[in-house]
């Protein structure tokens, strides 16, 4: 299963057609009776269990091989990003990723998720990916549970993401629901020609 749901699709057109807008918006279900502290402690696989399986949990972009992350993006069908811009985005994001401890290359992610927001009220989850050879091992769930727990632990109450229909079920199992207020995401779109005209 490819974890492609949480990537932004602003202005992306697939080959042979126009991309339908908008993608479904999902929000973390805050209607439960659990406190932020209880949510922050709720992970299905502990860090020590992941370590025993050969995966180290990382909560910072420090040490992350951005080139290797870009390779994972490409293998799951995400567009490659300019590395310097990706580094800047990571500096302004909450990040959770898993490193393969057995790998000879330090900093290579096998699972990754990030969220950006105001740090107080709102966050949007982006770029949830799992290395294709590691899919089906619960690593996507592991990074998402930790990312949500970290955000909730900091008091962020509105956590949203945009999901492709084929992975909505995955996010529902993690506590996300279609936006209960029926707020719909919108995307600002400019064609490549419009972008070129404004930059020249």
Curated annotation (Swiss-Prot):
Catalytic activity: serotonin + acetyl-CoA = N-acetylserotonin + CoA + H(+); tyramine + acetyl-CoA = N-acetyltyramine + CoA + H(+); tryptamine + acetyl-CoA = N-acetyltryptamine + CoA + H(+); 5-methoxytryptamine + acetyl-CoA = melatonin + CoA + H(+)
Transit peptide residues according to the UniProt entry: 1-41
E.C. number(s) listed in UniProt: 2.3.1.87
Induction (UniProt): Down-regulated by cadmium.
CDD domains per UniProt: NAT_SF (cd04301)
Pfam families: Acetyltransf_1
InterPro entries, per database record: Acyl_CoA_acyltransferase, GNAT_dom, NSI-like
Location in the cell: Cytoplasm; Plastid, Chloroplast
Role description: Catalyzes the N-acetylation of serotonin into N-acetylserotonin, the penultimate step in the synthesis of melatonin. Catalyzes in vitro the N-acetylation of tryptamine to produce N-acetyltryptamine, 5-methoxytryptamine to produce melatonin and tyramine to produce N-acetyltyramine.
Name the record gives this protein: Serotonin N-acetyltransferase 2, chloroplastic
Phylogenetic classification of the source organism: Eukaryota, Viridiplantae, Streptophyta, Embryophyta, Tracheophyta
Gene that this polypeptide is encoded by: SNAT2
């Amino acid at each position: 299963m490819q974890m492609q749901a949480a990537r932004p699709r602003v202005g992306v057109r697939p080959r042979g057609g126009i991309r339908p807008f908008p993608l479904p918006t999902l929000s973390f279900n805050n209607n439960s009776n659990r406190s932020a502290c209880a949510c922050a402690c709720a992970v299905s696989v502990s860090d020590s269990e992941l370590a025993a399986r050969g995966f180290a949990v990382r909560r910072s972009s420090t040490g992350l091989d951005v080139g290797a992350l870009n390779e994972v993006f490409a293998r799951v069908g995400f567009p490659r990003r300019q590395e310097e811009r990706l580094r800047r985005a990571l500096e302004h994001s909450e990040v959770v990723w898993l490193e393969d401890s057995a790998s000879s290359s330090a900093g290579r992610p096998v699972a990754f998720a990030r969220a950006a927001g105001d740090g107080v009220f709102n966050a949007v989850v982006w770029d949830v990916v799992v290395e294709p050879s590691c899919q089906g091992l619960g690593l996507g769930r592991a990074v998402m549970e930790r990312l949500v727990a970290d955000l909730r632990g900091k008091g962020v109450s509105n956590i949203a993401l945009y999901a492709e229909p084929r992975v909505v079920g995955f996010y529902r199992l993690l506590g996300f629901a279609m936006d209960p207020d029926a707020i719909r995401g919108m995307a600002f779109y400019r064609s490549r020609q419009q972008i070129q005209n404004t930059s020249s």
